Amino acid sequence: ENAAVHEVPIHDGVRTERHKLMYFPRNREWNLYDLLTDPNEMKSLHKDPAYNNVLAGLQRRYNDIRRFYDVNPAVIPNTRGDESWWRERDQAKKAIVKNGDIDLAFIGDSITQGWEGNGKSVWNKYYADRKPVNLGFGGDRTEHVIWRLNKGQFNNIQPKVAVVMIGTNNTGHKMQAPAETAAGVERILEIMKEKSPETKVLLMGVFPRGRTPHDAGRITNQGINQIIRRFDDGNHVHYMDVGNVFLDDEGNLPASVMPDALHLSEKGYELWAEAIESKLSALGL
């Protein structure tokens, strides 16, 4: 069965009888068209000084509508069931958790899934004898994790500790506002507490991305972390930002740690495991 749904932006622009404004969140750019002189929308006028007042007015209208409808896809459960590998992995993970004998769960995206790839030997060294499960799915955003948690991946387990890191694809795919991504993370924590109130959650700060400190994606991830660190309640949720262990003295991401400035090498997984080991022990694992 194909359980997929189509994700369609509810509001990606506004228009009047004459003008049309479009917003592109991935690169945070606006396009403005004069439908009277350019009915086929061939040339954007958003940088034309003659249209400054029109642009400003439509931007205000756009933002007012967004606030009114409170549109945030990061908190709306969303499946990727149209992708066969994702669907098969989902079914396989549900089979693993069905018996409930799990003490340690890792939840996230491709960086977490990578414990089965570049991080496999490190995983075996640190976690193989701790009744673990890897619930990382490459390409997932917060909304996909919400869907998975609600659809069986967290129904039969009561892990002692769950390591959660999610959000970098909200940045990479959409350049979503940090507050929106953080709201998705918060919803994930709420679901986990509802389903397994005794589980201690080690909430990871979203790892740095991009080769340099000035990378737009890295700055956005830092914005997410500034919000989600407040979710640490000292009891159920424990926040930990280990991003600095991956950086060199200039704040750059070495290729030896993240070859593509996003995903970890074996060395990167070793650094991650070393950074959280004492915390896992303190949480009772």
Residue ranges and their predicted role:
Residues P208-L285:
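Catalytic His-Asp segment of secreted/periplasmic serine-dependent ester chemistry enzymes
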Residues D70-I107, I111-K125, S281-L285:
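N-terminal secretory targeting modules
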Residues N53, G57, F106, D140, ...:
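Extracytoplasmic/secreted proteins, especially bacterial periplasmic and envelope-associated proteins
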Residues P73-R80, E116, N134-R141, G172, ...:
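Acidic/histidine-rich helix-loop elements
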Residues Q113-A128, T142-E186, I191-K195, L202, ...:
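Oxyanion-hole/transition-state-stabilizing segment in secreted/luminal serine hydrolases
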Residues K20-Y23, N31, D103-G108, K131-G136, ...:
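Structural recognition of the beta-strand scaffold that forms the well-ordered cores
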